[in-house]
Amino acid sequence: MSLFLLFCFVLEAQEKRTFEFKAPIVRESIFKEVGMNDREKDAYATNLAIFTANEIVRMKANQDSLGFARKALAVAMHLSPRNKRAVILKFQLEKGVMPTTLETQYGPKTLATLFVTRAEFLYQQKGNVNRLLARCLIDLAVTIDPRNEDAVYAYEMQKIDLGELAWGPITDAPKPVIPNP
């Protein structure tokens, strides 16, 4: 009898949580000094979070969509840590809740093109923070629209020149160091 109850409990828990998601850890923005104003950063974060939510729904929360979501949410939250869409999506995904499809201003082709254009502008501004965000945007753009030749070319040139983008520092902020008194 107790084995049956345990089975029912496990089955009920599985129904509530339809997928596992490892949320990005963002303690503070690494893009504070990036060459964008706060309104732009918030708009990019919102559109990225909406696109990500819609992709998760479209792809039924498969591993590819959840992997993309981890990177996209990390970028969105670094751009605008209090962005409503990004915070809500992160919460829902952590709980295993399928997000709602949302109306978006940008389809995949347009969003990827926007990211490539912004990345080119950020590269021209120079500085490590601008270049890091540019690399992130190119990486996301090539995932969003792998047929975008400008995104693919920029992505491949980045790999040749700099190697693969290390997402760890972006998706997994280190624990804060607490000094000894």
Indicate where each model-derived feature is located:
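Alpha-helical linker/edge segments of TPR/alpha-solenoid repeat scaffolds
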Residues: 45-46, 92-117, 157-181
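Bacterial Sec-dependent N-terminal signal peptides
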Residues: 1-16
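Alpha-helical segment of the N-proximal tetratricopeptide repeat
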Residues: 41-75, 114-129
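N-terminal leader/linker segments that initiate helical-solenoid repeat arrays
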Residues: 14-60
